[in-house]
């Protein structure tokens, strides 16, 4: 290519960057020039841009929806190959850690809000403001956006879909007990009635997951419901506060109503226990509907049997708190520039209404739309599963509207900015504290101090 051709190409690139030349005109002119210059040469196949994207939705229906969206994207972008892979969060966490250690991250992935804080501080991800603005910042629930917009004014991720944890109870276990869950407001109300719902070994009044990741969920939610937090205003552990001590005492009082071996149960075991009638209540999500359809008798697969019960507050709390599942897409800074640009193009395509609806409909009561308008759209609300489980849908929407659905370990909104929140979440320290008290009878104040000291010594101390 001669100097004249080089100057012309540079001018095209400059005009494209300045926005004076549209994408289509830029590509058309560039292609025409390339054709003239390359005419005498033998044609070669264009190398595709391979984009690796990991998400946390391995559900077969969701994989089918993602596959269809990717195929439609490929029809429009023949120079890009999207390699989409779904896996559970535990597998994702391990795979991401290995990829980071090897300095070979994917182009983009789902992650947790607390991981965004950590990755942002370490320079591992980059902002996605252009994606948020392209799909319509003003169209998205503010309570979805708030957790990923940082003090620098930038969005460091975009939530793929959301859900809020709800307290589920078996309505068919209430007759003859005198229990009215809708009257519950406090932990004392709950503790008063749990004995009436406990019929071992047939079923237990409550089931909880004892795996550390899920124990962390209950720690920060119950801390928040008792007016406290895992952290103080300076980001230091607040585990010796009266609110946390009270939360641990509450957990001890729940133990008689939990099934044997609960401390080794994972989240899926608790859902199946509720669906099969082995537990009267559970902390659950919208995807639990699938377990009900799989395990419960046909005549019980409805919200009259599988009810929404209110979450309660501790003696120092003012409002209950629930977990917000808002795993965001993030773009990794070390990925090649062309891959990052292609990943952003795919995300813009993914969030187009006709594509995004297919994705959300794959798990209709759990993968909830980030767009406000969908919750006023009859075609969205009248999906058969959303109609069947309308009380579940309404309960989740209410949590978002009142602003009491927070991401993992975020009892207070400012907690999301704590640099080591991800390291605390990844450690077993909080779960060890709970098990020491609930399973081994350790004094809550002693266990809380030991956990606090570990966080200061092993996490905060090493972060400085």
Please report, for each region that a protein language model flagged, where it lies by residue.
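Helix-loop-helix "hinge/cap" segment bordering the ligand-binding cleft or interdomain interface
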Residues: 75, 132-134, 149-217, 226-265, ...
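Short, well-ordered beta-strand elements
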Residues: 47-58, 80-85, 108
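C-terminal lobe and pocket-closing loops
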Residues: 287-301, 314-428
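Extracytoplasmic "Venus flytrap"/periplasmic binding protein-like
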Residues: 68, 72-143, 147, 172-178, ...
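Extracytoplasmic/periplasmic substrate-binding proteins
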Residues: 56, 116, 217-221, 248-349
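N-terminal secretory signal peptides
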Residues: 1-21, 29-34
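Conserved C-terminal helix/tail region of periplasmic/extracytoplasmic solute-binding proteins
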Residues: 175, 390-391, 400-464
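Hinge/lid segment of periplasmic solute-binding proteins
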Residues: 113-166, 188-191, 199, 218, ...
């Amino acid at each position: 290519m001669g100097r004249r051709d080089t100057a012309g190409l540079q001018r095209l690139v400059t005009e494209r960057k300045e926005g004076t030349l549209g994408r289509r005109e830029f590509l058309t002119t560039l292609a025409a020039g390339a054709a003239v210059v390359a005419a005498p040469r033998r044609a070669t196949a264009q190398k595709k841009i391979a984009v690796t994207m990991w998400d946390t939705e391995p559900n077969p229906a969701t994989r089918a929806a993602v596959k269809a969206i990717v195929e439609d994207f490929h029809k429009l972008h023949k120079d890009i190959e999207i390699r989409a892979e779904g896996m559970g969060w535990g597998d994702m966490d391990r795979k991401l850690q290995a990829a980071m250690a090897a300095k070979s991250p994917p182009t983009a992935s789902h992650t947790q809000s607390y991981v965004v804080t950590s990755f942002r501080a370490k320079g591992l991800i980059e902002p996605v403001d252009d994606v948020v603005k392209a799909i319509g910042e003003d169209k998205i629930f503010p309570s979805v956006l708030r957790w990923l917009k940082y003090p620098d004014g930038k969005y460091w991720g975009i939530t793929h879909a959301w859900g809020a944890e709800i307290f589920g109870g078996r309505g068919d276990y209430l007759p003859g007990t005198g229990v009215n869950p809708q009257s519950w407001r406090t932990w004392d109300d709950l503790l008063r009635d749990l004995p009436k719902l406990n019929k071992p070994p047939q079923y237990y009044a409550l089931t909880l997951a004892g795996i550390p990741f899920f124990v962390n969920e209950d720690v920060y939610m119950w801390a928040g419901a008792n007016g406290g937090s895992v952290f103080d205003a300076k980001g230091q552990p607040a585990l010796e506060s009266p609110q946390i001590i009270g939360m641990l005492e509450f957990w001890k009082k729940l133990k008689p109503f939990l099934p044997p071996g609960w401390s080794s149960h994972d989240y899926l075991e608790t859902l199946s226990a509720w669906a099969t009638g082995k537990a009267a209540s559970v902390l659950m999500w919208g995807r639990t509907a699938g377990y009900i359809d799989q395990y419960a008798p046909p005549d019980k697969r409805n919200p009259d049997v599988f009810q929404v019960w209110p979450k309660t507050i501790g003696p120092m709390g003012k409002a209950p708190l629930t977990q917000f599942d808002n795993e965001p897409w993030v773009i990794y800074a070390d990925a090649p520039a062309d891959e990052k640009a292609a990943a952003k193009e795919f995300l813009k395509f993914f969030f187009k209404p006709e594509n995004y609806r297919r994705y959300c409909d794959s798990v209709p009561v759990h993968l909830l739309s980030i767009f406000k308008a969908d919750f006023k759209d009859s075609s969205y609300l009248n999906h058969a599963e959303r109609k069947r489980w309308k009380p579940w849908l309404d309960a989740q929407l209410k949590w978002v509207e009142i602003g009491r659905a927070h991401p993992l370990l975020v009892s207070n909104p400012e907690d999301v900015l704590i640099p080591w929140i991800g390291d605390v979440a990844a450690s077993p320290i909080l779960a060890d504290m709970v098990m020491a008290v609930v399973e081994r009878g350790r004094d809550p104040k002693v266990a809380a101090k030991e956990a606090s000291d570990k966080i200061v010594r092993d996490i905060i101390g090493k972060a400085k």
